[in-house]
Amino acid sequence: MVKGLYDNFLANVEVSEAITDNVIECWDKYKTNSDNTIDVTSTSTFDGLQSANALELLDFQEDYKFQGALNNLLEIVQHLIRTNLHYYWVHFVEYHSGGYQGIHNHAHNEDYSLILYLNTCKGGQTHFESGVVCTPKKNNMLVFQATLNHGAKETQSWDNKKVLVCGMRISK
C-alpha cells in the first residue's frame, strides 16, 4: 500500500451520468439471475441484495457497457491517486428500506476501494470512523484506502439504495 501522501485517503468525485446509467442498467438487468447474487447473512449487509464478484459472473463479463464503465471508473481513480491499479473485486449492493451495512474495511483483499452511488435516496449515508459522512447522491463516487473502517446507515427511502463497490489492488 502507498504510504505517506495517501494515508487515510478519501475523495468524493462526481462521474458522468452515462457511466452510472450503464452500470445501473446492467445491475437491473442481471440481478434477477440467482447465479449473480449471494446470501448476505455472511456479509456486513443487512436487509439487502448483494451480487457475487461481477468480475467472475458471465452476464457482467460479456456486457460491453458494463466493462466500458468499469474501465472508465478505473481510469478516473488511477488519475486521482496517480497509481496503476487493477480490479480485484466488484459487486453490487441494493439496500431495501431499513437496510444498512455494518462497520467493516476491505484491507484483507484490497489497497483501494470505491463506492459509486447508482441512485439518490433518503438515509443510507456512508460513514467513516474518522467522522466523515457521505450522503448517497447519484453519480458520486467515494475513493478511499481499503484500511478505512466504514459502514452505511439505515436506508430510509422507499426507493432502494443501490451502489457499486469495487476493490482495487496496486499493479506491480
Predicted regions mapped to residue ranges:
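Non-heme Fe(II)/2-oxoglutarate
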Residues: 1-83
